[in-house]
Every structure is written in C-alpha cells, then in structure tokens.
C-alpha cells in the first residue's frame, strides 16, 4: 500500500481557553477595534457576560491547528508537511472569555495531484464549547511527504 500524508477519517483536536487579557491583545494585533473585544462594560451592556473574542482569533487558531498537525511526521517518522489552500468558516455563536473550546478537524478526502507534487486534502472542522458549536469550517490543503525540491507553482 502506498504511503499517504493523511487518511480519510483522520481526526485531530486541541483544547484552548482564551483569557480576558488575551482577547483584547489579539484583537489589537489584527486591528480589530470592536469594543466588544476590549471593553467589559460595553460587552455586558450588549448582553454578554464579558468580553467576546474576535472571530479572527478563534478562526486563525482553527486554521493553525492544520499547519501544526500536518507538520508532524507520520508514525513511522516519515516527514510530511502542507499548505492551506482555502478555508471557509461559518460563525455560529460568540466565543466567550475563559471557556474551554475544543478545536477539531477531520480529513474527509485525499486526492493525489501530480501537477502539485502532492495530495489535496479536504477537511471538515469546528470549534465547540459546553454551549455547543461556535464555528464550523471546511478546509482544503496541499499535503506532501518528505522534503520538497521546489515550491508549488
């Protein structure tokens, strides 16, 4: 059987918690000045228990999880890596400060693309808290094994 950089059904996850200091720091770093991310009083007046995270924060963490996972070698030590080619993220509920959030991806398909010297992986993912789904996502990645001789065109 040919060695593959991933398998359909492969899942990976990470639990994170965004603190009340982390949320405004990230929002400022991406120039998101919405006061719901910076001002407790404004967030409470809007009906939230406190600060809510910028969508870019939890979305970027979910996307980064794919990069981290596929940069890890296979169980037999074979190096692998990948690049994100596209992500579609749908926000379902706000992310509150200081709640546990489970980020999860599952590979749904893998197709060899000789022109790109790799495989196109399709993934489905989400972020959940005890309140339910916070966001859902799909992703398309280019994966490869070993070291690349040249960057894909």
Predicted regions and their residues:
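Catalytic strand-loop segment that frames the active site of acyl-thioester-processing enzymes
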Residues: 1-53
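HotDog/MaoC-like acyl-thioester-processing domains
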Residues: 1-11, 94-153
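Noncatalytic linker/hinge segments flanking ATPase motor cores
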Residues: 28, 52-60, 142-152
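Hydrophobic beta-strand-centered segment that forms part of the acyl-chain substrate-binding groove
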Residues: 50, 60-106
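A generic structural signal for short beta-strands and their flanking turns/coil linkers
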Residues: 10-14, 22, 79-87, 101, ...
